[in-house]
C-alpha cells in the first residue's frame, strides 16, 4: 500500500475515497487511524479508533492500535486498561501481556503475574504467543529480583523466536564475503582527482550515513 512506502498523502486520499463509498468500513477506518498515528496526528487517530469502537466494541485490531497509541504518548493507565480488555476477549493474545508487563511493577502477589503463570501451565499456546508470554514473565521475575527465573524466561523467549525466524547464518556469511570482495576490488579503480561531482549519501536511520558524510567532508 502507499502507506507502507511512506506516500502518506496518496494513501490518505485513497482511504477517504474508500470511505465515500462505505463510510462505516472499519478496516479502512483502522488504516486511516494508523496513518494519522504515523503522521503524529494523535488526536485525530484517537477519534477514529473510538469511532470504530463505538460501533464495534470488540474490534480487537482497533483496541490494540489505540492501546499502543496511548502507550506511545504516555497514557499508561488507559493503555493498560485496553490491553486488559483484549485479554478478556482473547486470553491467548499474549502480546497484550507483554505490553502490560512493560507498564507494571510486579511482586509475587500481582494478579496479572499469577494469571500469566497459570496461562503458561494451563493453556495450549502457539510458539508466537509463548514468545510474548515468556518475555512478559521475564520482566515480572526481574521486578521481583528473581534473576534466575527471569533469565530462564528470557532465554526461552529468544530460543523460540530464533526458531520462528528461520535465520540462516550461511546466507549472511556469503553476503558479507561478496561485500568484502567488492570492497577489495575498489583498490584497482583509477580515480580522476581533477573532476568534481556532487555526491549524495542515502541511507536508512542509524545506518552510519551521517558518519560517512563527516568523513568524506
What function would you assign to each model-found segment?
Residues 1-217:
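Alpha-helical solenoid repeat scaffolds of the TPR/TPR-like class and their adjacent stem/linker regions
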Amino acid at each position: 500500500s502507499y502507506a507502507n512506502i511512506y506516500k502518506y498523502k496518496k494513501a490518505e486520499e485513497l482511504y477517504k475515497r474508500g470511505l465515500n463509498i462505505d463510510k462505516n468500513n472499519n478496516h479502512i477506518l483502522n488504516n486511516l487511524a494508523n496513518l494519522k498515528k504515523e503522521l503524529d496526528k494523535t488526536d485525530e487517530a484517537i477519534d477514529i479508533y473510538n469511532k470504530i469502537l463505538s460501533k464495534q466494541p470488540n474490534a480487537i485490531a482497533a483496541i490494540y492500535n489505540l492501546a499502543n497509541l496511548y502507550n506511545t504518548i504516555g497514557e499508561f493507565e488507559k493503555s493498560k486498561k485496553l490491553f486488559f480488555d483484549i485479554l478478556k476477549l482473547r486470553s491467548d493474545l499474549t502480546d497484550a501481556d507483554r505490553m502490560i508487563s512493560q507498564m507494571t511493577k510486579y511482586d509475587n502477589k500481582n494478579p496479572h503475574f499469577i494469571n500469566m503463570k497459570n496461562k503458561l501451565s494451563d493453556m495450549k499456546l502457539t510458539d508466537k504467543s509463548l514468545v510474548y508470554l515468556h518475555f512478559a514473565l521475564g520482566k515480572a521475575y526481574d521486578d521481583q529480583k528473581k534473576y534466575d527465573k527471569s533469565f530462564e524466561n528470557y532465554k526461552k523467549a529468544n530460543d523460540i523466536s530464533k526458531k520462528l525466524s528461520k535465520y540462516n547464518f550461511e546466507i549472511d556469511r556469503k553476503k558479507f564475503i561478496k561485500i568484502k570482495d567488492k570492497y577489495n576490488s575498489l583498490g584497482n579503480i583509477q580515480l580522476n582527482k581533477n573532476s568534481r561531482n556532487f555526491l549524495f549519501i542515502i541511507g536508512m536511520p542509524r545506518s552510519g550515513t551521517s558518519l560517512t558524510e563527516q568523513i568524506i567532508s
